[in-house]
């Protein structure tokens, strides 16, 4: 009726079955625990399959003076999942609906069927998602950011106008402020990158806090784990970290400092300082040619 009163649910294989209203049971029931505990004891198995049908609780409720109602939904909102195949079908439906909602809200998906989202993914208007991007749980992306191909993001908060990827990995408790950049083959975990800070290539940033307008050179590693405990690094504003550097935590690098390429830094760096930690270069004039000639003679001897 208009109040959607429910008096019985009849299984398809029962003699009384006669589908005239176009409705079928989704298998989802909601009941007060006290009433459920009472009525479930009264269920009998006097049916064609000699089974105990939980759905009989509706008829029992009506018999004992309780009222039941039903809620209608689309079939694909409550499809059954009893196998991996059915799970895949349900997941595809969820992903398709989620993609459509994102695009309707102003998010650009360049190849929608290749992008995968979690139930709680939030992406704001103006964002561009390139092909083959995966969002784990707990991701929020503010407006006008770009996520490039083959990136994997989970548990991360991304500000406005950020650039991620391609081939980037953002792990839980990562927070990127506006206009930050995380480039190809960069992994970030439990770290904060302030406004306009960038790590464009081949780096690992773990358990760290980076100030504004700081540059992390290619191949930089934040060494955060001593085999037992994780340690944190704090890098100030306007810091330049040269390529192939190792920053050994716990560590603080002050504002405006420079870390020379190839350095292994394990002591705090004061503000506006140059930190350099690598062997002194020596040039042996003419020795390179002598070594090459010697190696060539050895190679010729082996060939004979």
Predicted segments — roles?
Residues 27, 39-40, 58, 149, ...:
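Catalytic cores of nucleotide-enabled group-transfer and carboxylate-activating enzymes in metabolic
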């Amino acid at each position: 009726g208009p109040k959607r009163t429910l008096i019985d649910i009849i299984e398809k294989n029962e003699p009384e079955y006669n589908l005239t209203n176009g409705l079928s049971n989704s298998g989802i029931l909601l009941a007060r625990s006290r009433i459920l505990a009472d009525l479930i004891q009264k269920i009998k198995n006097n049916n064609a399959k000699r089974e105990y049908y939980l759905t009989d609780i509706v008829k029992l409720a009506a018999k004992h003076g309780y009222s039941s109602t039903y809620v209608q939904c689309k079939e694909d909102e409550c499809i059954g999942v009893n196998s991996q195949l059915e799970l895949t079908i349900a997941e595809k439906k969820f992903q398709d609906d989620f993609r459509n909602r994102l695009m309707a809200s102003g998010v650009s998906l360049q190849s929608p069927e290749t992008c995968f989202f979690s139930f709680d993914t939030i992406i704001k208007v103006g964002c561009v998602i390139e092909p083959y991007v995966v969002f784990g749980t707990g991701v929020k992306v503010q407006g006008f950011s770009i996520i490039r191909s083959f990136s994997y993001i989970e548990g991360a908060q991304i500000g406005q106008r950020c650039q991620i990827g391609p081939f980037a990995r953002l792990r839980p408790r990562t927070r990127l402020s506006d206009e930050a950049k995380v480039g190809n083959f960069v992994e970030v975990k439990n770290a904060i990158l302030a406004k306009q800070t960038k790590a464009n290539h081949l780096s690992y940033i773990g358990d760290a806090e980076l100030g504004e307008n700081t540059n992390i050179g290619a191949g930089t590693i934040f060494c955060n784990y001593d085999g037992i405990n994780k340690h944190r690094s704090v890098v100030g504003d306007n810091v330049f970290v040269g390529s192939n550097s190792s920053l050994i935590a716990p560590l603080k690098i002050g504002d405006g400092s420079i870390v020379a390429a190839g350095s292994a830094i394990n002591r705090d760096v004061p503000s506006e300082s140059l930190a350099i930690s690598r062997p002194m270069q020596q040039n042996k004039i003419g020795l390179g040619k002598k070594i090459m000639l010697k190696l060539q003679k050895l190679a010729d001897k082996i060939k004979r």
